[in-house]
């Protein structure tokens, strides 16, 4: 264990890549170091400690992590550089070889970074690695963000028992596990007391909530959180379509606090490609969920994830995907190009898509997405929206988000931060922001 006296008057810089779950966990790491006397750096200060929380969902994500690690070491010369997160769990030796790295810490111990910081170790001694076996990760560790925004991220679940053929995340995060409803509700109440007005529920597979807690499931959690006073709005983070039940959708439509905002990973609109991916639903189920949302909440924001160019995605299957999406009432697509990942079952599937075809398919879906997003914006012009105003002064403007996740701007007013306003926007600027 580290002598905590070495932390006195030390400063830390934090870098986070990837998902909302990572942001929640980085905040938890920051709070644990603050309790030891380590404060966050201010602008233009040089840190004593750099913590980089990484992502490894694609090859590009790995590349961005390496770039960020080198950037942190360069901007904070002489600092103790710690790398954690999914990339650190999957490729610790690769990270340890990067110049300037002193500690690589895997998924299980990431929230215990303070216990492994040896600030007195010579900076030229090379990197040490703290990493256990992923299959041994069984404990759920609660995390939540605590930045200056009125929106907080709350981790309710971790890990994944699905083994989609293209994905490495179960190898990085371990088996599915979650907190209890009582634990999550207590944390939401604590966040409310700190002044938060909106909470985003995050995890790797949040719809799988309840593992290890008999009688508890995600629907029960949603209903319990809907009773938390002080929080005006809960957003359901990305949720698998087979776990987004009709009862959750129907409840959300009449709820006091659950936002009409859904993020649902489709991955492909071809049933054959879904089979190759080992996804747990078909296009008929996905369509039924989206159509029910649109029926009960006509102005809900529905974001859909799609991966293009996966192994086995022949041209005819991509066309099936495109035609399926053309008929689906979504609001926006999040399009990802397939990236081959070492150790995944997808590598055994024949028919690899060329980079050029991946790019063409991605561009087609991006155009479709932009058309739908503009349609969504136009449908909301002139409608009354409820906006929670956030921290931040952007050239004299402040930003907020509506219940259905439309960004809204108004002249900066510090007194408005954290307050709620009902507005009827009439103008959309070039950045996709409603102006009030």
Enumerate the predicted regions with their spans.
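Conserved SAM/AdoMet-binding glycine-rich loop
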Residues: 81-82, 90-91, 193-318, 326
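Alpha-helix N-cap/loop-to-helix initiation residues
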Residues: 22, 58-61, 88, 241, ...
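Glycine-centered loop/turn positions within well-structured domains
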Residues: 111, 162, 207, 242, ...
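Terminal RNA-binding accessory module
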Residues: 348-436
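Proteins enriched for Cys/Gly/acidic motifs involved in redox and nucleic-acid/cofactor modification
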Residues: 1-209, 223, 247, 262, ...
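Short flexible coil/turn linkers enriched for glycine and charged/polar residues
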Residues: 147-150, 160-161, 258, 268, ...
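Residue-level signal for inorganic ion chemistry
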Residues: 51, 86, 113, 201, ...
